[in-house]
């Protein structure tokens, strides 16, 4: 695990974005942890979040021309990542996001920002069912662009309805790479290093035995 990954987990726990306990997911599964990126809701948090996304992107070394943030949660993530790439990595990258409903007046259409063209890096918080990715792929293909990769905060490393995780399904279906700042395995490693989280680690390991990939 790299320093920026350790720092990200610490940051997420400090801000209450990553919590431990019992949480019923949409799938009906009772998860021993919950990740809610919507709680990165202050200016300073958002600036810091962008730096983590930018670090993960640079670390992965995937070539791309434009950042795309699917509405709604992907919009501030794409924005802050673009700022962090410019400020910290000397990369002035265009970004784009979509509207949920197409605008019929003014500039019209359902895309805002830079043209969606070339190699697209899609940024979002997590992939649960892959629905947002599939909807975004329709937009990307309509613009004759290609999906270079997907960047998310946390890989839950959890099976969907079949044997694969939602991330593995996205990678298979769209022949692309999904990059995450951290994975659930990284979270477990971090908790082990910090100490005092034996119950949380045991609960996560049991959950992974049932639903992990």
Curated annotation (Swiss-Prot):
Pathway per its UniProt entry is: Pyrimidine metabolism; UMP biosynthesis via de novo pathway; UMP from orotate: step 1/2
Q: Which residues bind orotate?
A: 34-35, 128, 156
Q: Which residues bind 5-phospho-alpha-D-ribose 1-diphosphate?
A: 26, 72-73, 99-100, 103, 105, 124-132
Kindly indicate whether the keyword Lyase belongs to this entry.
Answer: no
EC numbers on record? 2.4.2.10
- Name the residues that span the membrane: none
Any one of the GO BP annotations:
pyrimidine ribonucleoside biosynthetic process
- Gene3D superfamilies in the record: 3.40.50.2020
Q: Which cofactor does it need?
A: Mg(2+)
Which of UniProt's keywords are assigned here?
Glycosyltransferase, Magnesium, Pyrimidine biosynthesis, Transferase
> Which reaction is the catalytic activity of this chain?
orotidine 5'-phosphate + diphosphate = orotate + 5-phospho-alpha-D-ribose 1-diphosphate
One GO MF annotation is: magnesium ion binding
UniProt similarity note = Belongs to the purine/pyrimidine phosphoribosyltransferase family. PyrE subfamily.
PANTHER family linked: OROTATE PHOSPHORIBOSYLTRANSFERASE 1-RELATED
- Quaternary data: Homodimer.
The record's NCBIfam families line, in alphabetical order, gives: pyrE
Cited function: Catalyzes the transfer of a ribosyl phosphate group from 5-phosphoribose 1-diphosphate to orotate, leading to the formation of orotidine monophosphate (OMP).
- For this entry, the protein name equals Orotate phosphoribosyltransferase
Organism encoding this protein: Alteromonas mediterranea (strain DSM 17117 / CIP 110805 / LMG 28347 / Deep ecotype)
Q: What gene does the UniProt entry assign to this protein?
A: pyrE
């Amino acid at each position: 695990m790299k320093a920026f990954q350790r720092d990200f987990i610490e940051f997420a726990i400090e801000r209450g974005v990553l919590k431990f306990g019992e949480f019923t997911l949409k799938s009906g599964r009772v998860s021993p942890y919950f990740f809610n990126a919507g709680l990165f809701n202050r200016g300073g948090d958002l600036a810091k979040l962008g730096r983590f996304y930018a670090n993960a992107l640079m670390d992965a070394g995937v070539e791309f021309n434009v950042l795309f943030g699917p509405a709604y949660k992907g919009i501030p993530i794409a924005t802050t990542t673009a700022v962090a790439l410019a400020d910290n990595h000397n990369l002035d990258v265009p970004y784009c996001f979509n509207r949920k409903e197409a605008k019929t007046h003014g500039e019209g259409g359902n895309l805002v920002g830079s043209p969606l063209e070339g190699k697209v890096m899609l940024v979002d918080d997590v992939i649960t069912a892959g629905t947002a990715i599939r909807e975004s792929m329709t937009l990307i293909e309509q613009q004759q662009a290609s999906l270079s990769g997907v960047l998310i905060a946390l890989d839950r490393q959890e099976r969907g309805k079949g044997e694969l995780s939602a991330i593995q399904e996205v990678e298979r279906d769209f022949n692309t790479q999904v990059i995450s700042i951290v994975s659930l395995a990284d979270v477990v490693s971090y908790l082990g290093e910090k100490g005092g989280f034996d119950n949380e680690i045991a609960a996560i390991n049991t959950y992974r035995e049932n639903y992990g990939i």
